[in-house]
C-alpha cells in the first residue's frame, strides 16, 4: 500500500474518529495532535507553541510573508521570522517528512495542500448534518444544543479561515478534495468502508501506472 490519506472535516462530523479507525484497520500510522509533537521535535520549538497556533486563522499579510519565506528557503533566516511563520513552516515540513515514511492518515492542518503534488495522496473531506453534529458535540462536552451549535460555528469558521489563507483552495468545497463524504448518511463505520474502497481503486490505478 502506498496511499497517504488526508482528512479534512467539519467540526462534529466524527472526522477524527473516522481517521483513527481507518488507520487502525489498515495498520498504518495516524497523525492528528501527533503531528504537532512531530513538528515540535523536528524543529526544536516548544510543543505548546504548536498547540496555541493550531489551525488558528491568520491574516493575508502574514500569509504572504510565510509563503515568500518558504519559496526562497528559510534555513538561514529562521531566527528572524515571526513566531507564526516558524510554527507554520515547521508544521508544513513535518507533514512532508511524515509522507516520506510511508502510508498514513493525517487529519487537518492543510495536509492535502502540503502534499498536493504527491501522486499517492487521497484527500478526503468529511461533513455531517448539523443536528448530528450538535448532538455529538453536546454529548461530548455536556453542552446545551444552543451552546454546541455556537461552538461548531466558531470552530468551523476558524478552520475555514486557516485553510483558505494557507492554500489556493476553499475549505469544505468539493473541488478542493478527491472525495467528500457525509457521515450522517453512511455512519462512522460506513464512511470508513467507503474510504477503504476508494483506496483500493486508487491503489489499483497506481499499480497499473507502474506496470506500464
Report the location of each language-model feature.
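Pre-Walker A (Motif I) flank of P-loop NTPase domains
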Residues: 1-10, 102
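Glycine-rich phosphate-binding P-loop
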Residues: 7-20
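Short beta-strand-centered segment that lines the nucleotide-binding/catalytic pocket of NTP-utilizing
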Residues: 29-40
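ATP-dependent small-molecule kinase phosphotransfer cores
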Residues: 40-103
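Small-molecule kinase domains that catalyze NTP-dependent phosphoryl transfer to phosphate-bearing small molecules
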Residues: 55, 59-66, 70, 144-188
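RNA pseudouridine synthases
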Residues: 98, 111-117
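Conserved phosphate-donor/acceptor-positioning beta-strand/loop module used by diverse small-molecule
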Residues: 117-139, 145-153
Amino acid at each position: 500500500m502506498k496511499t497517504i490519506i488526508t482528512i479534512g472535516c467539519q467540526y462534529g462530523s466524527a472526522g477524527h474518529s473516522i481517521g483513527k479507525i481507518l488507520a487502525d484497520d489498515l495498520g498504518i500510522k495516524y497523525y492528528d495532535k501527533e503531528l504537532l509533537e512531530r513538528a515540535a521535535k523536528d524543529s526544536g520549538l516548544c510543543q505548546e507553541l504548536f498547540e496555541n497556533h493550531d489551525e488558528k486563522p491568520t491574516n493575508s499579510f502574514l500569509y504572504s510573508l510565510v509563503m515568500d519565506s518558504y519559496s526562497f528557503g528559510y534555513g538561514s533566516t529562521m531566527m528572524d521570522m515571526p513566531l507564526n511563520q516558524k510554527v507554520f513552516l515547521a508544521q508544513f515540513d513535518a507533514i512532508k517528512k511524515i509522507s516520506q515514511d510511508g502510508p498514513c492518515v493525517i487529519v487537518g492542518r492543510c495536509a492535502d495542500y502540503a502534499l498536493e503534488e504527491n501522486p499517492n495522496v487521497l484527500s478526503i473531506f468529511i461533513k455531517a448534518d448539523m443536528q448530528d453534529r450538535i448532538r455529538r458535540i453536546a454529548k461530548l462536552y455536556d453542552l446545551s444544543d444552543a451552546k454546541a451549535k455556537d461552538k461548531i460555528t466558531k470552530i468551523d469558521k476558524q478552520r475555514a479561515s486557516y485553510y483558505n489563507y494557507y492554500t489556493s483552495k476553499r475549505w469544505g468545497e468539493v473541488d478542493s478534495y478527491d472525495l467528500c463524504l457525509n457521515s450522517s448518511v453512511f455512519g462512522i463505520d460506513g464512511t470508513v468502508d467507503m474510504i477503504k474502497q476508494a483506496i483500493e481503486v486508487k491503489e489499483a490505478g497506481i499499480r497499473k501506472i507502474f506496470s506500464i
